[in-house]
Regions:
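Mature catalytic core of soluble alpha/beta enzymes
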Residues: 1-332
């Protein structure tokens, strides 16, 4: 390849999982790259058809409708993802939980703008949350709930799984240089772009209006030891260099509502039943996009207090959080 005339990029995209998936590919054969990219996006759409909470025909919708009354068989791929979600729930101390759906509904975020529930409603929803309510039978490849009202929502892991599937399809097609993202919140790098060591990915900082000088519940709509220093200016997340690695960013300000002078975000702590309020942004980088998707949510929920423990779950993990008090916490 002539370094002065690098391989042209081929881009493909689709809308799935309520967001836009895009793939940028580099290589010598543009037609082959485009075909590989389209096949990778087909993988994303196939997974959406299995996991969607809002499609009555999906495997997860069927589980939610029937599993409290009888075991429901699912495909091996979906069962494997549910087992992975259970492991991540345990590793995160419950900060990541795919049974969060009753709380999401309670707070009005399931297809709505959000609403303030009363304490009794929160308590009822919390009683339905927890992986102890989900019985997985590997011999039958089935799922069962022990309570009526338990629901699964794979929104915090499904996008990462879709990107992993797309990346695997690209590699099987011989692609060695590509960048995949789903709504920019989860990104996966394959190899590196021409004439570069890796893919540069910037993390957008939280809006300055969300920062607070003091702590207050619900008030606000990396090979080195962890650093945690308060700053007096808006923290600026670093630009990360990705090569055969995935990055996920979780933040709570995308969907929120105001009530009584407070702003409540859509990311909920399954352990308390309340919206996350002290951490504005969390990012995780690992080779597996399924894990970065889930663990970035767990990190946002766990906050600064749980950052060190979560960062120690994987040797190669890089993490970053930004708190409402303008504190940037990085583990590289």
């Amino acid at each position: 390849m002539d370094p002065l005339n690098p391989e042209p990029a081929v881009a493909v995209a689709c809308n799935a999982m309520a967001t836009r998936f895009e793939i940028v590919l580099h290589g010598a054969n543009a037609a082959a790259l485009r075909a590989a990219g389209e096949e990778a996006l087909d993988e994303v759409e196939r997974l959406e058809a299995q996991l969607s909470l809002y499609r009555p025909s999906s495997e997860i919708a069927r589980v939610n409708a029937l599993a409290a009354r009888r075991p429901v068989r699912v495909s091996p791929a979906v069962f494997q993802l549910l087992e992975q979600a259970r492991r991540l729930h345990g590793e995160s101390g419950g900060a990541f939980d795919i049974t969060i759906a009753p709380l999401v509904r309670c707070w009005g975020f399931m297809g709505g703008p959000g609403q303030l529930p009363d304490p009794a409603q929160i308590a009822l929803a919390r009683s339905l949350v927890g992986m102890q309510h989900v019985i997985l039978d590997p011999e039958e490849c089935s799922v069962r709930f022990d309570l009526e009202g338990v629901m699964l929502d794979l929104g915090a892991i499904g996008k990462g799984c879709a990107i992993d599937r797309a990346a695997r399809a690209l590699r099987e097609s011989g692609v060695t240089s590509a960048l995949i993202h789903g709504g920019t919140s989860t990104t996966c790098a394959i190899g590196h772009p021409p004439s570069a060591e890796g893919w540069k990915v910037a993390i957008a900082p939280p809006p300055i209006a969300l920062f607070s000088a003091t702590s207050g519940k619900g008030e606000a709509k990396e090979d080195s030891p962890a650093s945690a220093a308060p700053t007096h200016a808006q923290p600026s997340p670093p630009t990360l260099l990705l090569r055969d690695e995935a990055l996920s960013v979780s933040a709570g300000w995308g969907k929120s509502f105001e009530s009584g002078g407070r702003t409540y975000g859509h990311v909920l702590d399954p352990r308390t039943g309340e919206p996350v309020s002290e951490t504005l942004l969390a990012a995780v980088a690992l080779p597996c996009a399924t894990e970065t998707d889930a663990l970035s949510t767990a990190l946002l929920v766990a906050g600064a207090a749980g950052a060190k423990a979560l960062a120690g779950l994987r040797p190669a993990m890089r993490t970053l959080i930004i708190t409402k008090q303008m504190k940037l916490v990085v583990n590289r």
